[in-house]
Amino acid sequence: MTSKKQKSSIDTITPTPPNTTTTTTTTSTTATTKDKKKSKKPKSSGLTKVGADIIELQASLLNRPARKQATHVNSRYEDHDTDTTEYNIWYHKKLGNRNWKDRDVSETRCNVLKDCGKTRANKDANFCCYFARGKCINGADCTSLHRIPTPEDDKRLRLTHDIFGRERHKTDRDDMNGVGSFSRDNRTLYIGGIKTNVSGSLEDMVRKNFEEWGRIEYVRVITNRSISFVRYLTRSSAEFAKEAMTDQTLDNGELLNIRWATEDSNPYAKKVDERNLHRVATEVINKRIREMTPDDQSALKYQMTGQYPNTDQQYDQNGQPINASPSTPYQLQYRGSTKYEAHPYARQYNNDLQKRVQSGETVDVAPLNGVGNYYSHSVGTMNQELQKQQYDNYMQQYYQAYGYDYSKLSDDQKLQLQQYFQSYYYGNQQEQQQQETQQIQNNNENNNDNEEEDDDDEDDDDDNEDDDNDNEETKDNKNDKVENKEEENKEVQEKINTESKEDTKNEEQEKKEEKEKTDSDNIVNKED
């Protein structure tokens, strides 16, 4: 009795011993067309059981040695004219022409539950690209990983490299092939070349063949264009699936064209990609911080700390907040300070100020040093009884905070403090105004002087131009004289050279004649 649900190829795979050397590892069981017509399989929503458990099934098989998937590596191009004498020592290849083969169905395919196992690679090594294509000839001696990536592997991925250790680029290729781009999260594959004139669900067929490489987020099939889109939960699974399914076939013998999908125009998908990119960036930063030395971490934390105001007076010894009067938006800046703080004096007269503003009495309301508001105040004096009373209350509270009793001071002492306070905070206002006016006058005088100097400079420039013209004429005359002298010197030097050459020739001729005479004399002597 056949079940209504079609079994996938992974369900029927049984692990084989590592000594077996089969090149093709594709196994699939399909139901008969009668069973398909009788039982219509509903569209699957979410992950199937096999796709979710493939990582757990693989984990139980990683203790065995990985088997060799093939005995030789089939190249995608044919070599021609390689029997030449020139050899490239950089690439370790002979020079010659290479012609690419036409696209054809791959002879091998990776079977995870048959081929996975332990190799000589450590846990931080890259994944084997030939293992993904189903044609690794090294097996257990391979220095790369022979398994599919897990979510833990995706966390340690680098943005600039893929899981196979290949360098990624800033932008995608024009044909959307290759290793992909690090500017975006490549998790969606484009599958072209699907046959649509078949019975059964295309989505189930695509899911069955692609869920072997990792957990799938969604599968979308566009029937009228014979294409499909598969989106994985992790980038590592998508990169592995792209290599594993390139030039492969589905259940109907079609040749698949696997590429990276372009950016999705769906706003929801864009938000999801932004969140994933933010998550990946956060994980990379946290990983970088964990890899730092303790000294570097402490230095980084010191840079991240900020300066905060002292709030000790706002809390008692038990750490409970003290009930203080609410602060006002009117603030003063003390001389020499770098922060604005609420002035206690402004808090007390603020209510009276608001009443005056509401009643329209704003003639004498003006900002104090550009910060806060003050009214009816002339520098160096206290011209209202209300202000004197408020000032006394403020000083009493101010000194009470530091442990002093302001009420015990005499009137002369209070007057001295008041004068000191006024001179310290407001005493330099008149001096500043005088300095500004004096500076303006000085600037005007300097401008007038500069104009006169400019006129004098123009006259001097005219005189300088005339002098320059005269100097140029004299220079030209001097240059002509120098040129004439140089020509005369050249002629004299040429004469001297010719005479010296003639003298050397004569000397050489005389030496030759003397030598000939001596040779002839020697010959005569020998004959005698």
Swiss-Prot record:
Residues 448-471 have a biased composition (Acidic residues). Residues 1-47, 429-528 are annotated as: Disordered. InterPro entries: Cwc2/Slt11 (IPR039171), Cwc2_RRM (IPR034181), Nucleotide-bd_a/b_plait_sf (IPR012677), RBD_domain_sf (IPR035979), RRM_dom (IPR000504), Torus (IPR032297), Znf_CCCH (IPR000571). A zinc finger (C3H1-type) spans 122-149. Residues 9-32, 429-447 have a biased composition (Low complexity). Keywords: Metal-binding, mRNA processing, mRNA splicing, Nucleus, RNA-binding, Spliceosome, Zinc, Zinc-finger. Residues 472-528 have a biased composition (Basic and acidic residues). GO terms for cellular component: nucleus; Prp19 complex; spliceosomal complex; U2-type catalytic step 1 spliceosome; U2-type catalytic step 2 spliceosome. Its main location: nucleus. GO terms for biological process: mRNA cis splicing, via spliceosome; positive regulation of cell cycle; positive regulation of RNA splicing; spliceosomal snRNP assembly. GO terms for molecular function: pre-mRNA binding; U6 snRNA binding; zinc ion binding. It is found in: Nucleus. Involved in pre-mRNA splicing. Binds RNA. Associated with the spliceosome. This is Pre-mRNA-splicing factor cwc2. It comes from Dictyostelium discoideum (Social amoeba).
